[in-house]
Amino acid sequence: NLFDAKLIKNNDKYAVELGGHVVELSEEKQAALKANNVAEQEITLGLRPEHISLSDSGVAAEIDVHELMGSTIHLHANADGKDVVIVVSTMDMTTEQINSLRGGAKINFTFGGNVCHVFSKETNINLEA
């Protein structure tokens, strides 16, 4: 999943903003961005489907298609016009929760500041490298 997002600084800490949702980056990513003297900027944010989690708040999306794959559900959703693939574990979900993840359902998702990837929008270079 690749998103148009913003790299911002709050109290000298780097964070990414996606769909109005702000996630502070991990200490390792903080150090790499500081070492590279990276400024606030528009970025391409990379997120693997298995690193996205459903949440009560976060980035809003609507499920287009769901695929039950045994112990996971693969969700194909739309977040502000952008296609998103999310892989959700069903291990700790009730049948009711699993059944609620159907086409047309409204969801919110988030991600950890340690698992996202920050790329320059202009050069496509990983800003953490």
Predicted regions: what is each one?
Residues 2, 6-129:
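Non-catalytic connector elements of ABC transporters
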